Amino acid sequence: KMGYWGFFPADEQWGIVPVWGFGTVIASKHPRAQVGEVVYGYFPMGTHLLVNVDKANDVSFFDNHPQRVSSSPVYDNYLRCAQDPSYQEDSQAWLLNYRPLFMTSFVLDDFVGEHISDKVTTVLLTSASSKTAYGCAHLLMKHKAQRGGHYRVVGLTSAANKALTESFGCYDEVLEYKDIEQISRDGESWVLDFAGNKQLLLDLQDLLGEKLSREIFIGATDVKSQTNKPKGKLHGQLFFAPHQVKKRTEEWTREGFNERYAKAWSSFNAHMQDKIQVVEYQGAKAIQDLYQQGLAGTLNNEEINVLTF
């Protein structure tokens, strides 16, 4: 449905899981792809990737392999780490785990800043313990004053994740899902939905009524709720990060976009350094076991993982 099996096609009955990662060029017949250089981008969950280098410049290159079918050019782009202002070799673990998510956090915060009005007093983020959500929350808090905003940044999460989410220090307030009645209705609200739980969204629509001025759908971390399809119409809009990336890249230039992103990333990375532990896994069996934990929803939210074959 989301097109993920098209990135690195396999035989019909199989799918190759795509992951964000770092790769080192070990052989090249293209003058703009140098052996030994490190690049960041979308890779198959494997040891090697053969690319057809296209649109190469000093900052990045694209893969135009004919078998590859991507939903956006963002996924075909490989960034040269030597030219990346946000790259540091000793922070690879953080970039691996957060960069693709924080890129969404970054452009979503930018989108909010572009469209939010001074009538909005509450910005609600569901699945508040998810990386994309609390990355965005950090930026919403950071940019509140310079935007002249009067909003409070409120996270909604499960009872099990409430204390952890509060410890991140990215929200004005964190509420359990069962406590949504405590949400202020004094002014207008935005909902940034990362959970994809339709029943929760319907409950928020009923609770906030006309005070809900915007509802944005970003993700679907609540996998179990996807089988539950309650009746009722949602009134929001889908946020597709690559569209905002493309818009701002055209307006700010690629260099300007990367500089703004690097500044935001530096702020978030410094804020989170003492709150998350890096754990490394090696070998196919360890990777498979961790993948199964992800499917079961049992990953440790206090850890970020680095996987190598």
Named regions from a protein language model:
Residues 2-49, 55:
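Glycine-rich beta-strand-centered segment in the early N-terminal region that forms part
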Residues 123-127:
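Conserved N-terminal Rossmann-fold NAD(P)-binding element of oxidoreductases
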Residues 202-270:
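Glycine-rich phosphate-binding loop and adjacent beta-alpha segment
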Residues 139-142:
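Extended repeat-based interaction scaffolds and adjacent low-complexity, acidic/S/T/P-biased segments
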Residues 247-309:
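C-terminal hydrophobic helical "lid"/dimerization subdomain
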Residues 133-134:
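N-terminal Rossmann-fold NAD(P) dinucleotide-binding loop
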